[in-house]
C-alpha cells in the first residue's frame, strides 16, 4: 500500500492497526511533525466508563466523584437549554413589538441558549454513554417541566400548542 499521500504521518508498522483510534492509543501519531504524543485515546464509538474527557482537557479525569459531577453538570446544562428554549423571554411581546431593548434581550437569551445547546452537543461527542444518557434525560426533564402540558395551566391559550424552538436542537 502506498503511504506517500500521508504527508509526514508515520507509516503504520505491520504489528499495529492503522485505524485512527489505534494510532492515537499507541502514541504513534504526532502533531505537525513534532514529538508530542497524545496521552488520551479519542473514542469513535460509544463506551461505558468514568475515564473520559468532557468539554475540557483532563476533566473529569479518573475520579468517580468528578465523573458524577460531570454527569450532573451535563444534565443541568440540558435542562437549562430546554428552559431557555421554552422561556417567555424569547416570545415577542404583544404590546410593543418594535421595542429594541426587548429585541436585544431576546437576542442575548437566544445566543445563550444556542451556546448551551452546543456545549451539550460537544459533551455528547465525548462518546461516553453515561454523558449521552444524562443529556437525553436532561432534555426530557426540561421539556416535561417547561415545554409540555404536564405542568401548565391549560387556560393559557398562548402556551397550549407546542411549537419547536428554532435553531439548533442539540
Curated annotation (Swiss-Prot):
Belongs to the copper transporter (Ctr) (TC 1.A.56) family. SLC31A subfamily. The chain crosses the membrane at residues 65-85, 114-134. GO terms for cellular component: membrane. It is found in: Membrane. It is a multi-pass membrane protein. Residues 1-29 are annotated as: Disordered. Keywords: Copper, Copper transport, Ion transport, Membrane, Transmembrane, Transmembrane helix, Transport. GO terms for biological process: copper ion transport; pollen sperm cell differentiation; root development. Its main location: membrane. The keyword Transport applies. Coiled coil: none annotated. Induction: Down-regulated by treatment with high concentrations of copper. Copper transporter involved in copper acquisition and transport in leaves. Required for copper homeostasis and normal plant growth and development. This is Copper transporter 1. InterPro entries: Cop_transporter. One of its GO terms (molecular function) is copper ion transmembrane transporter activity. Residues 9-29 have a biased composition (Low complexity). Expressed in the root apex, lateral root primordia, embryo, trichomes, guard cells and pollen grains. The increased root length and pollen development defects phenotypes of the mutants are completely and specifically reversed by copper addition. It comes from Arabidopsis thaliana (Mouse-ear cress). Disruption phenotype: Increased root length and pollen development defects.
